[in-house]
Amino acid sequence: MSRLTIYLPEVHKEFFNKLNFIYVFLILLFFSHSLFASIVSDTTAPKYQQPDIHHYIEERKTCKAQNVHCQGAKFTTINITTPNEKGLSHNKYDEFTLKLGRGHNKVFFNNLMIDSPGFIGNPNLVDKAAMVILNEVTSNKKSELHGHLAVIGHKADVIIANPSGIYCNGCQFSNTDHVTLTTGIPTFRSGDLGGYYVTQGKIIISSNGLKHNDNSNVFLDLFSASLIINGEVRSGDVLTATGNNDIGIMPIKGSVDLKPIGDLSNSNKIDVVVDVTKLGGMYANKIFIYSKDGGIHNKGIIEAETMADLVSASFIKNNFGKIDSPKIRIRSSGDIDNIGGRIKSRRQGLSYNANDKFGIRIFGRNVNNSAGSIYINSGHISVGAVDSITNRDGIIKSIAVTGGADIKMKAKKVNNDNGYVITTQNIEIDATDLANNRGKIVSAFSHVDLHYKTLSTEDGIIHGGIEVKSEVKP
């Protein structure tokens, strides 16, 4: 059910009387589709899953006439459905879009049990407010979110699930600790939300970004077949899981179980499923990016206050991108490229577990840091590869005033031609073939331990503040 309130411009009475019914109807139709959020209940769903939707345009005093060219804020209030015994309010829609307009657009999820200033209590809330508000789109219409979405009343987790895709350009969320955007189909377990079945759909964060940071203790989940970030994403903890996955959650805000769907060798899979463009960025306390059947490409900024964790079954490219966090883990079954990129950990002065000595861990089939930078100011660096590590014209550096600063590198081939591996403490390199032509492997105050079968170091420098140990493998 929908209620529409419209402020039409004042017109001369005689002229208005000449308007026929059809013309008036067309004007109303134009206003209803262009001024408001296009949020429409799924009338084919059971009644108890159909939310009540109400629209309102606020009068703007500076407007001579309220019309599409001059108007106040546009509000859409959703009286969410009655929550079940688990506190889950399941709402189904034919369309869920918050349109871009001249005013300040807002969608309110009404979780009020009683009236409050400016709002009427939700009659669907009989004996309790919702803990989780699930908004499921059942049609083939993608969701476009261009404004502010807020829970009024009791704080609740908000989920928008649309297999046809979600486009966010300046969307904001408030009064909710946990937001989930997904192109998966919700799954259930004993009346509770069990997770999402993701086989299609794209989430796009456009230039005006996504904001969800009422405070640092909030969670943002992005679950989709593919993800494009072309603007800033800001939240507390961010978890992205891309590709075809059966995602299990228990409970919400708790652990997440990812089970890939289908054959990972499928030739039809998407090559890049997470793409952070040059104009894109992710800023959060913790950032987890998991790609089960495609690659991760970052040309923008991934910046986490506590941890950044990137995992891909295909490849990870940080070419000319930036990853910045006190603790960084980058793992892939394929290649990892940091060509011209920066991977930086700043832990000096921060308190962390004494056993958590590694600030940066990188492991892939091949790791390429050509003209790139891997830097930490307190803690160890570990770079490992199944086949090769290339640091040609690159820098791997660990400089610490206090605490650990070891650098460990292990692969069949390690190439440091014209490169720098520098630390104040220990360096350990284990390789079959080690090349350091015109390169520098330097420990300012401690040991350099080299294990290799062949060594090429024309015009190269290998220096240990205490000593250099070399072991030639049989």
Regions found by a protein language model. Give the residues of each.
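N-terminal secretory signal peptides that target proteins for export/translocation
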Residues: 1-18
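Solvent-exposed adhesion/ligand-recognition segments of exported proteins
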Residues: 36-303
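N-terminal intrinsically disordered, low-complexity tails enriched in polar/charged
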Residues: 3-7, 38-42, 473-474
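Bacterial N-terminal signal peptides
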Residues: 22-34
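Extracellular beta-strand scaffolds
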Residues: 85-88, 103-107, 113-115, 139-143, ...
